[in-house]
């Protein structure tokens, strides 16, 4: 290797370095580690990267949006002449701060809130461009499922062939009705408790265009839906008449509370524990025409291509009058299969591989730092803003959390990205 070869290239080795792959860190603009860590995780989610590069290829001169800026950033990384380096996502950050004023400052931001905003906002952009149709001067942009252009094919294959890859806001919500008949906001909280009442789970809202409406172009799902959207089914059994009713709800990610010395598998099992509705929380049974005691459970009906799991690491403590970090040890396996699926689940045996983890480093939501680890071609890499390092798979255990309940600074998994093996 020549004198200009980076340390990372030396560690990987010229023979083992993935062809046409690029490992580029992202420059931090004062407080943008929250976005850098999420962007790296998304870049190494194969289906997402391919669709963003495909969008770039189809839209030659698009109006500047957050999606076009993201596409430019991904394209810049994917077409670098060097294999390793760093790049400044200035255009993307500038646009982000214009789009959402909460990010237009130098305060500590929450990585999950950013992910939530980004995914929903990209979806809205796609829907808006689809509704605009050929009149926007970009007729190809309306084709979500067609073949890519030659440019798209070359870029996407270049990356895909080498890509095997707060506060803990309660604003995350579910649909307040049968999602199969709604394209509006999803705004009814879902709360599923285990036997001790200590573990809950919620889902990230799908702001609009859930792909099941009847209003023209909005009736077709976008590629954001195809990648991230799953379906939960809420099953409620009246204890008086035994009638079972169900309601479907879409989600882009699942949020789970964390408990000490547990695992993601345990958290997801508890997510589907049966909850008894009684006393002031009785269920209104349509068959009985009255409020009755009932049993309710939540199960997964459709497993998404990319399963994003948010560990709710920040909790408000009255005695401290502030949010504190919950650094409990939660094991997240390299392989994951969901067992809390419904009887009519579309793909109940789907097997997932851990692709990326956004990690929070620090002692609370208003202080600390975000980094990410990603899997690429069998290699594990750590991205810390503009720095990129190769790590061993065993290092992942360092980010499970602490076995002690003492509140102190820690480096813990915060957002997990699991990619379905059938789309690898």
Curated annotation (Swiss-Prot):
Keywords: Hydrolase, Protease. Residues 131-189 are annotated as: Disordered. PROSITE patterns: USP_2, USP_3. The keyword Transcription regulation does not apply. Its EC number is 3.4.19.12. Residues 133-144 have a biased composition (Polar residues). It is an enzyme of class 3 (hydrolase). Gene3D superfamilies: Cysteine proteinases. This is Ubiquitin carboxyl-terminal hydrolase 12/46 homolog. Residues 145-189 have a biased composition (Low complexity). It comes from the Eukaryota. Catalytic component of the Usp12-46 deubiquitylase complex consisting of Usp12-46, Wdr20 and Uaf1. The Usp12-46 deubiquitylase complex associates with arr/arrow; the interaction leads to deubiquitination and stabilization of arr/arrow. The active site is at 33 (nucleophile), 369 (proton acceptor). GO terms for cellular component: cytosol; nucleus; peptidase complex. It catalyses: Thiol-dependent hydrolysis of ester, thioester, amide, peptide and isopeptide bonds formed by the C-terminal Gly of ubiquitin (a 76-residue protein attached to proteins as an intracellular targeting signal). One of its GO terms (biological process) is negative regulation of Notch signaling pathway. Residues 24-421 form the USP domain. InterPro entries: Papain-like_cys_pep_sf, Peptidase_C19, Peptidase_C19_UCH, USP_CS, USP_dom. Belongs to the peptidase C19 family. Disruption phenotype: Viable but sterile with reduced lifespan. Severe defects in adult intestinal epithelium; increased number of intestinal stem and progenitor cells in the adult midgut. Conditional RNAi-mediated knockdown in the central region of the notum results in notum malformation and disorganized thoracic bristle socket pattern with socket duplications or loss of bristles. One of its GO terms (molecular function) is cysteine-type deubiquitinase activity.
């Amino acid at each position: 290797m020549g004198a200009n070869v980076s340390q990372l290239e030396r560690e990987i080795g010229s023979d083992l370095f993935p062809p046409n792959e690029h490992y580029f860190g992202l420059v931090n603009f004062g407080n943008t580690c929250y976005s850098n860590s999420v962007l790296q995780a998304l870049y190494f989610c194969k289906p997402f990267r391919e669709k963003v590069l495909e969008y770039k290829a189809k839209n030659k001169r698009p109006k500047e949006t957050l999606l076009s800026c993201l596409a430019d950033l991904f394209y810049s990384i994917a077409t670098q002449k060097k294999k390793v380096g760093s790049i400044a996502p200035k255009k993307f950050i500038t646009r982000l701060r214009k789009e959402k004023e909460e990010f237009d400052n130098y305060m500590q931001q929450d990585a999950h809130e950013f992910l939530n905003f980004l995914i929903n906002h990209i979806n809205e952009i796609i829907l808006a461009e689809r509704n605009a149709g050929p009149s926007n001067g970009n007729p190809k942009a309306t084709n979500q499922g067609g073949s890519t252009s030659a440019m798209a094919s070359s870029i996407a294959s270049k990356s895909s062939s080498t890509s095997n890859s707060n506060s803990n806001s309660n604003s995350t919500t579910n649909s307040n009705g049968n999602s199969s008949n709604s394209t509006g906001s999803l705004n009814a909280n879902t709360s599923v408790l285990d036997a001790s009442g200590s573990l809950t789970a919620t889902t990230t809202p799908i702001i609009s265009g859930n792909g099941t409406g009847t209003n023209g172009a909005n009736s077709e799902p976008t590629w954001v839906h195809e990648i991230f959207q799953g379906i939960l089914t809420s099953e409620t059994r009246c204890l008086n008449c035994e009638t079972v009713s169900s309601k479907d709800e879409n989600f882009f990610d699942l949020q789970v509370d964390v408990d000490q010395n547990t695992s993601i598998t345990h958290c997801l099992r508890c997510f589907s524990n049966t909850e008894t509705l009684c006393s002031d929380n009785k269920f209104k049974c349509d068959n009985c025409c009255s409020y009755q005691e009932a049993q309710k459970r939540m199960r997964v009906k459709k497993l998404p291509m990319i399963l994003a799991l948010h560990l709710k690491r920040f909790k408000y403590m009255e005695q401290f009058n502030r949010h504190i970090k919950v650094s409990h040890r939660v094991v997240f396996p390299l392989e994951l299969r969901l067992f809390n699926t419904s009887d009519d689940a579309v793909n109940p045996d789907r097997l997932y591989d851990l692709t990326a983890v956004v990690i929070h480093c620090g002692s609370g939501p208003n202080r600390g730092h975000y980094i990410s680890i990603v899997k690429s071609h069998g290699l594990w890499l750590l991205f810390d803003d503009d720095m990129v390092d190769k790590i061993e798979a065993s290092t992942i255990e360092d980010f499970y959390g602490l076995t002690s309940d003492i509140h102190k600074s820690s480096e813990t998994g915060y957002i997990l990205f699991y990619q379905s093996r059938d789309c690898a």
